[in-house]
UniProtKB/Swiss-Prot annotation:
Binding site for IMP: D13, E14, G15, K16, N38, A39, G40, H41, T129, R143, Q221, T236, R300
Entry keywords, A to Z: Cytoplasm, GTP-binding, Ligase, Magnesium, Metal-binding, Nucleotide-binding, Purine biosynthesis
GO molecular function: adenylosuccinate synthase activity; GTP binding; magnesium ion binding
Binding, substrate: A296, V297, T298, G299, R300, K301, R302
Gene Ontology biological process terms in this record: 'de novo' AMP biosynthetic process; IMP metabolic process
The name this protein goes by in its record: Adenylosuccinate synthetase
Catalytic class of the enzyme: ligase
Residues where Mg(2+) binds: D13, G40
NCBIfam families named in the record: PRK01117.1, purA
ATP-binding recorded as keyword: no
Complexes and interactors: Homodimer.
Amino acid sequence: MKVDVLLGLQWGDEGKGKVVDVLTPNYDVVTRFQGGPNAGHTLEFNGEKYVLRSIPSGIFQGGKINVIGNGVVLDPLLFKQEAESLAASGHDITKQLYISKKAHLILPTHRILDAAYEAAKGSGKIGTTGKGIGPTYTDKISRNGVRVGDLLHNFEEKYAAAKAKHEAILRSLNYEYDITEMEAQWLEALNYLRQFKLIDSEHVINNYLKEGKSVLAEGAQGTMLDIDFGSYPFVTSSNTICAGCCTGLGVSPRNIGEVYGIFKAYCTRVGSGPFPTELFDEVGDKIGQLGHEFGAVTGRKRRCGWIDLVALRYAVMINGVSQLIMMKSDVLDTFDTIKACVAYKMNGVETNEFPYEIDDTIEPVYVELPGWKTDMTKMRSEDEFPEEFNAYLSFLEEELGVPVKIVSVGPDREQTIVRYTEE
């Protein structure tokens, strides 16, 4: 067996939680391989809405194994809150969830450092969620991090050393803080974490594959936020692309199977950073209102714009996407015409390749397509798709070179249509 991967192809918030919930019945194991509690996956189960920040979305499927991989950074306090919320709703996850010993811990001082660094940047801030993600990955790369497996040996010494280094940095920044209460809660949450099975996830995942178990790897955020290939420096601190699955779980590239690339029928972005197709008019406001575009974790209003095929082609290439999944098609139901960016104009020169750096001087080159002007929310089969919508899908497939296999026409699970188009 191979690991199938589900990835966001834009700037995050594509709707991965819902799609994972639809796909998980087909898998034995669901994993997370990167990121932390800065991004939430929203999904509905039995009429209830849940936001999962660190726990894999397969947790609602009875009998599924869920693994938090080594590439994830874990905040014990936020993890405890998330797990207890699930338990209060009748979901006991202690037997279903395994955690990699090699996953790094987000310390209380990481969160303080995050706030201090952002404050020091002034107008140049990147819009961090303040969850300590960046400083935790910084410590990981500089070999100063504290890992989940350290709970089993010499934890107090390693924690004290990391905390002392952080406090020295904060003194140099003249940043005032008090972590007394947060630290007490965090240390209490560590004890809660100990009840879960702490594993050498690379061995466990590869043994599952040898046993013939099917594995789905669930990415967080989106390709355009990747630390290497995203719109740097307005990116996250981990590899959100398909290659991140290999390093974040310990699997060979030869063991990657299907790569599902998920995108919205339009674009959104949260926080600072370039956004070539952003709309500042009533059209952008309308998309945001119809799409309920607010962050699952931060509650921040998302910036909205037309679909960017330059960025999407780039994301498809980087990830080796084999199947596309389009979300929120219904949000565009009422538009007379729909625009799609097919190229950028930079210094008067047109290009269809994603550049080294994108900024406000980039001018999107649009094509216009007729809208379908039809309520798609009640459709349950591709046979019901209006002609204009089929034309839009064909246009996207031609531009991206990959079939759109799944179309979402609403937030509920049954509003997910699998297309049976030929290869």
